[in-house]
C-alpha cells in the first residue's frame, strides 16, 4: 500500500466516524412519544425569602393529583422554618447536600442530618420538619399528591 493510499484511509476513518456522530445527534424525537426539557429549559421560579427556587416538572402541586417539583436551595445557610404538609412527600437529592431536621425546635447547626446527592427521603404528612442548604447549592426532586400546602409548626 502506498503512503498516499494509507494517508487517505487514515483520513477517511475519522471523517466517517464524525459523520456518524453528526447523524446520531441530529435525531428528532416524536413529541407524541417523548417530551423533555434540557437543564437550561427548566422554568425556575423566583428566589423566595428562605433562599429557595422551585420549578414544576409534572402536574400542579396546588391541585389534587400527582406532582413533581424541582427545589433548589441556594448555599449560605438557607433553611425553611419548622413546618408540615398534609400528605407524604418523596424527595431525591439530585445535587449537593441537603440538611434535614425534624420536630419544632429549629437548630440548623446542631439539629440537622446531611443527605448527600443520591439520597431518598420521605416526609410523612402532618409531621414537623425543616430543611435547607449550608455551604453548597442543593437541588431536590420532590414528588407527592397535591394539594401540596405547607403549614408552619407554630400554627399546628
Regions found by a protein language model. Name each.
Residues 25-70, 155-156:
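A short, N-terminal "cap"/entry segment at the start of jelly-roll beta-barrel domains
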Residues 2-14:
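Bacterial N-terminal signal peptides that target proteins for export
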Residues 33-35, 110, 128-156:
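Double-stranded beta-helix
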Residues 12-22:
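Bacterial N-terminal signal peptides
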Residues 80-82, 100-101, 123, 128-134:
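Short beta-strand His + acidic residue motifs that chelate non-heme Fe in jelly-roll/DSBH
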Residues 62, 104-126:
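Short acidic-glycine-tyrosine-enriched beta hairpin
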Residues 67-85, 124-126:
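Conserved short histidine dyad/triad with adjacent acidic residue
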Amino acid at each position: 500500500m502506498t503512503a498516499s493510499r494509507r494517508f487517505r484511509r487514515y483520513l477517511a476513518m475519522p471523517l466517517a466516524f464524525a459523520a456518524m456522530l453528526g447523524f446520531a445527534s441530529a435525531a428528532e424525537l416524536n413529541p407524541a412519544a417523548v417530551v423533555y426539557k434540557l437543564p437550561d429549559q427548566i422554568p425556575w421560579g423566583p428566589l423566595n425569602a428562605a433562599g429557595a427556587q422551585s420549578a414544576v416538572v409534572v402536574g400542579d402541586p396546588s391541585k389534587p393529583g400527582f406532582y413533581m417539583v424541582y427545589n433548589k436551595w441556594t448555599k449560605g445557610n438557607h433553611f425553611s422554618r419548622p413546618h408540615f404538609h398534609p400528605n407524604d412527600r418523596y424527595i431525591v437529592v439530585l445535587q449537593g447536600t441537603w440538611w434535614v431536621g425534624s420536630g419544632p425546635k429549629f437548630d440548623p447547626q446542631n439539629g440537622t442530618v446531611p443527605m448527600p446527592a443520591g439520597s431518598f427521603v420521605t416526609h410523612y404528612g402532618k409531621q414537623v420538619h425543616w430543611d435547607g442548604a449550608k455551604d453548597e447549592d442543593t437541588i431536590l426532586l420532590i414528588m407527592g399528591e397535591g394539594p401540596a400546602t405547607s403549614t408552619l409548626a407554630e400554627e399546628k
